């Protein structure tokens, strides 16, 4: 019987391999700690002090190891976001659609396409994006906002049964990772990241080399340059110490320097991961509050027999508002909560299908 862990890992690998050319490019440009170790070993054997110092120049190493293999994709995503902010939805969609499947930013592109369609009142296409993200292959590794997108869109079309199903899926698929990330904000280390550290060899880090760590760590944690830089220092100093001790070449002063680098980089690596986890935990907390708010609204609509005019339910438009407001069209009263600088007027449904259960 195939285990859940194996299934998730296989799904992640399939996703990563959807863009074979991109992955191959990353490998070709990758920096290998093992290969570096062989060069360092040769320099130690030859007692070539200058070559050893050159190999231990971390500024040079970071520049060569942490190359940007998806800069154009990231730039397209950033430009698409700027266009979206300007309400140039068609132009932003054009760029989102250019982000290839299997790249590190594809999940974000699909989610943001969903919000694009949502703002254009195209609920069908918004749901198409969210359902892609919440498919069995991806539902445990995408960010929590994908669930908010689907839930809010379902509220907009009065699919109350769908809302409760989405929230149940959120609890089932995301609770474990949300809790793990919350704990990580305090510790900076867990079993999943310890495995990543132990196995890390190629830089920059790529998704296909990270196994099932996505289930227990912040979204796109491996794209953070500061984290990668500290991990690189840790791995290089660790490898250099192994070589020096194996060759028994003395160099106690160099060993002491490397040992300090190793310890410092490990502490900074943990601190950075804790910061990433803390940031994501704050966002996750907001998402949970939003989902709770939507659920309360759905329950209120189901159990309260309000008489609403067709005119009230005919527009369903969105408008700019003050920070942290969500307004439903049932009575126009604002719900103040940890919401992200926008107000939503939920699109109403025809009276006959309003209570879709």
Predicted feature residues:
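Extracytoplasmic/secretory-pathway proteins
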Residues: 29-32, 36-43, 52-55, 159-357
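"A position-specific structural signal for the A-helix of alpha-solenoid helical repeats
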Residues: 37-41, 77-78, 112, 148-149, ...
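Solenoid-like repeat scaffolds
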Residues: 31, 60-69, 97-105, 132-140, ...
């Amino acid at each position: 019987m195939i285990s859940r862990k194996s299934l998730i890992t296989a799904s992640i690998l399939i996703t990563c391999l959807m863009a074979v050319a991109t992955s191959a490019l990353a490998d070709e440009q990758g920096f290998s700690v093992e290969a570096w170790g062989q060069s360092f070993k040769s320099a130690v054997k030859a007692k070539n002090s200058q070559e050893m110092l050159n190999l231990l120049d971390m500024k040079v190493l970071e520049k060569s190891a942490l190359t940007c293999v998806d800069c154009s994709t990231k730039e397209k995503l950033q430009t698409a976001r700027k266009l979206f902010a300007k309400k140039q939805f068609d132009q932003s969609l054009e760029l989102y659609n250019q982000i290839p499947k299997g790249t590190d930013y594809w999940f974000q592109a699909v989610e943001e396409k969903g919000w694009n369609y949502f703002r254009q009142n195209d609920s069908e296409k918004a749901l198409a994006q969210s359902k892609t993200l919440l498919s069995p292959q991806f539902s445990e590794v995408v960010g929590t906002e994908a669930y908010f997108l689907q839930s809010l869109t379902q509220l907009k079309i009065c699919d109350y049964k769908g809302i409760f199903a989405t929230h149940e899926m959120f609890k089932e698929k995301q609770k474990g990772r949300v809790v793990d990330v919350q704990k990580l904000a305090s510790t900076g280390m867990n079993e999943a990241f310890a495995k990543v550290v132990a196995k890390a060899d190629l830089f920059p880090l790529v998704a296909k080399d990270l196994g099932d760590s996505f289930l227990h760590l912040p979204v796109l944690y491996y794209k953070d340059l500061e984290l990668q830089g500290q991990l690189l220092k840790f791995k290089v100093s660790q490898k250099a110490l192994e070589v020096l001790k194996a060759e028994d070449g003395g160099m106690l002063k160099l060993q002491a320097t490397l040992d300090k680098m190793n310890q410092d980089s490990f502490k900074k690596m943990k601190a950075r991961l804790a910061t990433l986890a803390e940031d994501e935990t704050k966002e996750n907390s907001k998402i949970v509050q939003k989902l709770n708010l939507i659920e309360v609204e759905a329950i209120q609509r189901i159990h309260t027999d309000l008489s609403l005019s067709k005119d009230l339910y005919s527009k369903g438009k969105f408008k700019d508002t003050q920070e942290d407001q969500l307004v439903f069209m049932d009575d126009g009263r604002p719900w103040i909560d940890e919401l992200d600088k926008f107000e939503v007027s939920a699109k109403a449904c025809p009276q006959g299908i309003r209570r879709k259960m």
